[in-house]
Design a protein with these regions (language model features):
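Structural and coupling elements of P-loop NTPases
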Residues: 1-615
Length: 615
């Protein structure tokens, strides 16, 4: 009979984006008495970085711990977005059970499926929380049936299918085992976790085994490895061995051990089997590596991380406006920042190219890479990035590309247009149903390159009423056809100067304008989207000729259409292969790779000729 540590439970909270997972963790923290009576607590306290708070999403996995009646519950809050799935997979190794949070109205969504699949593969015990039960449109019974169907589809074992269900309202801080009535607190959730999630095995008297699952960095203590003690004990000052991924061994001394209490990371002297801790002392510690005693070097199985599916080129900013707005503009500074990102983000890959000021950066998806760019921009970096490209992989001699599972809910009158547009992007319909409130729910498998830039088109097609989610499904044999991409050409500035109201008014018939009057522009910069398929070079700096002749009708007031200001994501989705996005702390500009019109036209002719010769 193996001993268990009944005073500890290790759980991960998984859910789809925006189903209330981080709010639920906040309430668990508050009700466990972690905060003082007079302590101010931010909403969504676990989403600690600015972008997480702005977008209302969790990007990095976070640890916290609460005490309930003498039992310490270690909670890992995981990202709900598949782009950050690299984090999710490693967390599953650190815990013994998962709390699956599902919206009482929306039910199961693609990301729920992605993360749950990882949890079931690790044989973890699930507890299902049907959240937002207080919503008027809640349909708890239907959602529980959907969850059961999903478990069966993901080949859960019999024990996992017997999952307990807790009905909760995280915003109100209430829960119960009965969907019809709510208790005043989350007590039923705490007790369900303690009753159903297995306690960790207590083998503290055996030789130490600690595996790193997440990384952090601190200017004072350097690199920090976060993980679980699987066996034995670890004390500050211990001399231990680190078994690297390639099998080599490095010795180091444990300088600090941190435990988690509420949102704080506190220094502790000792940790034992079953504890989730952070360790410092080894500079180049990496995810998946094992810490053991010198005399008992036994590595744990290496953690497998999903490969990147999307890549883009990062370049030093060489536009005419380079260096005007950013603090960090050189190749060395950008290289250092990318290396720093690699310290903690294991789903990211950075490769050098023939050019010293260009790098290929590969990640798990558009969101993953755009959040890195947004972070760099806010830190004062200037750079240029290319259109995202999917990564082609050779599997058993066949060239394969990533496919995504797309789930969308649209008003019935828009369903035909959405089906047609996904079909044009080589999507394959898996399912089509009508929801209780009359929306059409569509499920497609679509090549990932077909989804680049699709969200904007989808939103305009459904007039903002549609909901779309997509997540990586698998690699499949590559489709040879051209998929997706922008159909219209660009309006390109022919000159450097300031955009004038007079010129913008004259261009409104030509397409959609991106510029406010007075915006500085340069030759080769994209200032709008053309109505037609070809690019058009325009003079957006043209001013009205002043004469001393007055005209009675000429100066009547003209109204100008509001310019379309692109966000970073929209800019990345908009550009074509021969274009770049220039990113600075103050601006997001679009430009052609070749700024000069004559050189650009010669290059286009040359490429066209080569293609004809190859045919």
């Amino acid at each position: 009979m193996t001993n268990k540590r009944e005073d500890v439970r290790n759980i991960a909270i998984i859910a789809h984006v925006d189903h209330g997972k981080t709010t639920l963790v906040d309430e668990l923290l508050k009700q466990s008495g972690i905060f003082r009576e007079n302590e101010h607590v931010d909403e969504r306290a676990m989403d600690s970085n600015d972008i997480e708070r702005e977008r209302g999403i969790t990007i990095l996995a976070k640890n916290t711990a609460v005490d309930y009646k003498g039992t310490r519950i270690n909670i890992l809050d995981t990202p709900g977005h598949a782009d950050f799935g690299g984090e999710v997979e490693r967390i599953m190794k650190m815990v013994d059970g998962v709390v699956l949070v599902v919206d009482a109205y929306e039910g199961t969504m693609p990301q729920t499926r992605f993360v749950l699949k990882k949890a079931l593969e690790q044989n973890l015990k699930p507890v299902v929380v049907v959240n937002k039960i207080d919503k008027p449109s809640a349909r708890p019974e239907g959602v529980v049936d959907e969850v059961l169907d999903l478990f069966i589809e993901l080949e859960a074992n019999d024990e996992q299918l017997e999952f307990p269900v807790v009905y909760a309202s995280a915003v109100n801080g209430t829960a119960s085992l009965d969907p019809e009535k709510q208790d005043d607190n989350l007590q039923s959730l705490y007790e369900t976790i303690i009753d159903y999630v297995p306690a960790p095995i207590d083998n503290s008297d055996e030789p130490l085994q600690f595996q790193v699952a997440l990384l952090d960095y601190n200017d004072y203590v350097g690199r920090i490895g976060i993980g679980r003690v699987f066996r034995g004990k670890m004390r500050v000052g211990d001399n231990v061995s680190l078994i690297k991924l390639d099998g080599t061994v490095k010795n180091f001394r444990v300088t600090k051990i941190f435990g988690y209490f509420g949102l704080k990371r506190l220094a502790i002297e000792e940790a034992q089997a079953g504890d989730l801790i952070a360790v410092s002392g080894m500079e180049d510690i990496n995810v998946g590596e094992t810490v053991t005693p010198h005399d008992h070097q036994e590595a744990l199985p290496v953690l497998r991380i999903d490969e990147p599916t999307l890549e883009m080129t990062f370049k030093v900013n060489n536009s005419p406006f380079a260096g005007r707005e950013g603090d960090f503009v050189t190749a060395r500074q950008i290289q250092e920042r990318l290396n720093q990102q690699l310290e903690t983000d294991v789903s990211l890959k950075v490769s050098n190219t023939d050019s010293p000021d260009t790098w290929v950066v590969a990640g798990r998806g558009e969101l993953h890479l755009s959040i890195l760019i947004e972070n760099m921009r806010r830190e004062g970096y200037e750079l240029q990035v290319s259109k995202p490209q999917v990564i082609i992989k050779e599997i058993d001699g066949v060239m394969c590309e990533p496919f995504e599972r797309v789930q969308c809910e649209v008003p019935q009158e828009n369903a035909g247009a959405v089906i047609e547009s996904l079909g044009a992007r080589k999507g394959e319909m898996v399912d089509m149903t009508t929801t209780d409130n009359g929306l059409t729910r569509l499920i497609f498998n679509v090549p990932a390159r077909g989804m680049i830039g699709y969200t904007t088109e989808f939103m305009s097609m459904t007039r903002g009423y549609g909901i779309i989610n997509h997540t990586f499904e698998e690699f499949r044999p590559r489709i040879k056809a051209q998929i997706g991409g922008r159909r219209n050409g660009a309006l390109i500035s022919m000159d450097q100067g300031s955009a004038s109201t007079y010129a913008i008014l004259g261009l409104e018939d030509r397409g959609v304008n991106f510029m406010e009057p007075g915006t500085e522009v340069y030759e080769g910069m994209i200032v709008g989207e053309h109505n037609r398929e070809n690019d058009l070079t325009v003079n957006i700096t043209k001013t009205k000729h002043q004469t001393n002749v007055r005209s009675a009708t000429k100066d009547q007031t003209q109204t100008m259409n509001r310019p379309r200001i692109l966000t970073l994501e929209e800019a990345l989705q908009f550009i074509n292969d021969d274009e770049l996005v220039e990113v600075t702390p103050e601006s997001i500009r679009l430009r052609k790779k070749v700024l000069n019109k004559n050189v650009r036209e010669k290059e286009a002719k040359r490429i066209k000729q080569m293609m004809q010769e190859n045919e």
